[in-house]
UniProtKB/Swiss-Prot annotation:
Alphabetic keyword roster: Cell projection, Cilium, Cytoplasm, Cytoskeleton, Flagellum, Repeat
Tissue specificity statement from the Swiss-Prot or TrEMBL entry: Expressed in airway epithelial cells.
Domain of life, source organism: Eukaryota
Lineage of producing organism: Eukaryota, Metazoa, Chordata, Craniata, Vertebrata
Main subcellular location: cytoplasm
Pfam families given in the database record: DM10_dom (PF06565)
Protein name: EF-hand domain-containing family member C2
Length: 749
């Protein structure tokens, strides 16, 4: 009996409810209004009175985790069952039924089922997917329901569309899955064997085929080792045979098909045909056959006969010899037969493997575990001592080379010049390849003491010419002193079997005395091209190597302080420069003959000051002295005192801008351009000036300079152009301070 609807007796069940939408029960199908589904819930998703909604998926017990949909929880999970089917056959002459094996796949995410039949070779049945994936209904009278996971178990039967499948086993994942959802899994059941396939297998085992085919699978080996080649260095010693010699070979073993090719290393000018292939690529038999096989004698299989007909759509055929009568068994070289020190038989030739490349070593180490890859020594035997050929002495007719050629060949031939050297050292463009030296005749005759010569050495053919510049009213004709020819070294016999030695280019350098056909010449200087050539080829001219010269000076490091004081005393203007003669005299007193004259020239050329800088500096200082003399300005000590006062750190240097400000404030009688030019000459890399050196150079009373000479309107001869009389000194001024830093590592105080 229901309670009356009085206050306190009725309960509102919709309190806290937020979902009140109505389900759509009607829709259109082919433009016809109809009831879409009768399984949709009522208002708010609650079922109607008496309505039972069938679940879309199997009902699994909920765990303690999050309640996720089945298509997420069981994604990529498949249950696999092994089943078989007994199928009746129409032709019962051999058997009454067939056993067909299937794989049943159940997808728990949506309860779909798929049935596949594994392929059996020569079964005569259509195999593959038997039932595609979808939900399968239960057999009548429950056709309104679908198969779920609880309908599957080992030892049970399932009916799909009238066909009964007997499940006899499942995989480990399926067995574990069923146990987790509470299903007791039965043990596996023995599956019956197909009687028809059993009969066929027994027949095949007792029948020998008339056309037996031998399966030879080489694809795997080809794909695994394609492009991988073993390389061995070999030697075929054929010196024991007549006109035989030693042959250097390279053996390539192709791992993809076990073939071998051999190439020959032909030495230069061997006289052999330019055919590098010694053995074409093929399989190499271990045992050399006694004779060459005839065509068709070596085949993979023997063919008994062939048959064919002109009937259309009928293929020709042939029969193999299954007993393999007359087959030649050959054993070929494999990679396991090749190793260092092994001698292989290459069609009757004994080839020694004495070395291999790095890939071959790594291959044998990884596959066979070989660690020792010591190469085999195969040096040729020492040749017999060569009999020295003796030639008759020079007879005095013609040149020594022509006389020697007459003794070598039966038919006299001219002497062959070194054409390669001639082409490389011949003059072309701005390169003359001629070394010119300024020399003086060494003699006791007073008349010849002042004679000067130009000695030219031609690098193309090692010839020498001597020229004497013509001077007027000297009493000497001058001109060509020695025509171009090769000059022999003194002290050699004239009539001898060996060729004479001649003066070489490496024996000429500044300071050396050369004997030219009995005349002694002392080399005083050289032109710019010669000095540059000698400095570029220090391996042939060690006296032109600056590093070697500085190493000799470093041996006198104990005199470095004294040497610095001597240079400072010689540099009265504090310009860190001295003239060449002063520089040479100071170094000569220090080394006491340890340095050659060529080394002095090399050092002077490296540390020389450009002539434009020196002349510009002297010109500016002379111009400033002239201004000071006109204005009678002598107050230089005041400038030095002011600079000392400004120099708080006592470094003897001040910034350029401070010295310029001091000069302008003290009314120094110099124009702005001249002052800027002088400051730039004394400025260092840090924009600072040694104020003592600067004002000492400007002091025209203590450090006077020659007065400016008026410009000459006569045309003067340029000293840089080679006129046969080179400059007696290599440089006018030398930067001695840079030299001291490089040679002894001295720093400025």
């Amino acid at each position: 009996m229901a309670l009356p609807l009085l206050p306190g007796n009725s309960f509102n069940r919709n309190v806290g409810k937020e979902k009140f939408h109505k389900s759509q029960h009607w829709g259109f199908c082919n433009n016809v209004m109809m009831l879409v589904s009768d399984e949709k819930p009522g208002i708010g998703g609650e079922p109607l009175l008496g309505q039972k909604i069938k679940p879309k998926c199997s009902i699994y017990p909920k765990g303690d985790g999050s309640d996720v949909p089945s298509w997420v929880a069981f994604d990529k999970q498949v249950l696999s069952f092994d089943a078989y089917l007994e199928e009746e056959v129409l032709d019962k002459s051999q058997t009454n039924y067939r056993i067909r094996y299937y794989k049943i796949y159940f997808y728990p995410e949506d309860d779909t089922i798929q049935v596949n039949e594994p392929e059996v070779k020569n079964s005569g049945l259509l195999q593959g997917t038997s039932i595609r994936r979808h939900r399968i209904t239960l057999p009548p009278p429950d056709e309104d329901q679908f198969y779920t996971v609880y309908h599957f178990n080992v030892g049970t039967e399932v009916v799909f569309y009238g066909r009964t499948f007997k499940i006899y086993d499942c995989d480990a994942f399926t067995r574990n899955f069923l146990r987790k959802i509470g299903v007791k899994v039965n043990p596996p059941v023995q599956c019956p064997e197909d009687p028809y396939m059993k009969i066929r297998r027994e027949v095949v085992e007792h029948v020998e085929p008339l056309r037996p085919y031998e399966s030879l699978d080489t694809l795997k080996q080809f794909l695994q080792y394609h492009g991988k080649i073993l390389c061995f260095f070999c030697l075929w010693d054929d010196s024991v045979s007549m006109f035989g010699d030693r042959r250097e070979l390279i053996l390539h073993y192709f791992l993809c098909d076990d073939t071998i090719e051999i190439k020959e290393l032909l030495p230069h000018s061997s006289g052999r045909d330019a055919l590098k292939m010694f053995l074409r690529r093929s399989k190499l038999p271990k045992n050399c056959p006694p004779r060459v096989y005839q065509p068709g004698q070596i085949t993979d299989r023997a063919v008994l006969n062939s048959y064919g007909d002109f009937i259309k759509n009928q293929a020709d055929g042939y029969l193999f010899d299954r007993y393999k009568l007359g087959k030649v068994d050959q054993e070929f070289y494999k990679d396991s037969d090749l190793s260092l020190g092994v001698t292989i038989n290459v069609w009757g030739r004994k080839v020694l493997l004495y070395d291999c490349d790095e890939f071959t070593k790594s291959y044998y180490k990884s596959k066979y575990g070989i660690e020792n890859f010591t190469s085999v020594s195969c040096k040729p035997p020492s040749p017999p001592p060569k009999i020295e050929r003796k030639f008759p002495p020079y007879n005095g007719f013609g040149s020594e080379e022509d006389s020697l050629r007459n003794c070598i060949d039966l038919k006299p031939t001219p002497h062959r010049r070194n054409f390669k050297k001639f082409m490389e050292k011949d003059s072309y463009g701005s390169k003359s390849n001629i070394l010119r030296f300024f020399a003086k005749l060494v003699t006791d005759k007073c008349v010849d003491l002042d004679r000067m010569f130009v000695i030219s050495y031609y690098l193309g053919d090692d010839t020498i010419s001597v020229f004497e510049p013509i001077e007027r009213n000297s009493g000497i004709a001058g001109g060509m002193f020695l025509k171009r020819s090769r000059v022999k070294k003194p002290g050699q016999e004239v009539f001898k079997s060996e060729l004479s030695e001649y003066i070489k280019a490496e024996e000429l350098y500044i300071g050396v005395t050369v004997n030219v056909n009995g005349y002694l010449f002392r080399l005083l200087n050289a032109d710019e091209y010669t000095l540059n050539y000698m400095e570029q080829n220090t391996d042939k001219y060690p006296f032109s190597n600056l590093k070697l010269a500085l190493q000799k000076l470093k041996q006198e490091e104990g005199k470095s302080r004294e040497l610095k004081q001597v240079f400072k005393a010689a540099d009265s203007k504090h310009t860190n420069m001295v003239d060449y003669n002063t520089f040479r005299d100071i170094l000569m007193s220090l080394t006491v003959g340890n340095l050659a004259e060529q080394e002095f020239v090399t050092i002077a050329r490296h540390y020389r000051v450009p002539e434009g800088t020196c002349s510009d500096m002297d010109f500016l200082i002379a111009l400033a002295h002239e201004k000071f003399k006109k204005n009678m300005f002598e107050n230089f000590d005041t400038f030095i005192y002011s600079c000392v006062y400004e120099d708080r750190e006592k470094k003897n240097v001040l910034p350029t801008k401070d010295i310029k400000r001091l000069c302008k404030s003290s009314r120094l009688p110099l124009s702005d351009d001249l002052l800027e030019s002088l400051l730039s000459r004394f400025e260092d890399s840090e924009k600072q000036i040694d104020y003592k050196s600067f004002f000492s150079a400007l002091n025209w009373r203590k450090n006077p300079v020659p007065e400016l000479q008026p410009a000459s309107y006569l045309k003067e001869r340029c000293e840089d152009v080679w006129l046969g009389m080179p400059s007696p000194i290599p440089a006018k001024y030398i930067d001695y301070w840079t030299f001291l830093k490089d040679a002894f590592g001295l720093e400025e105080e």
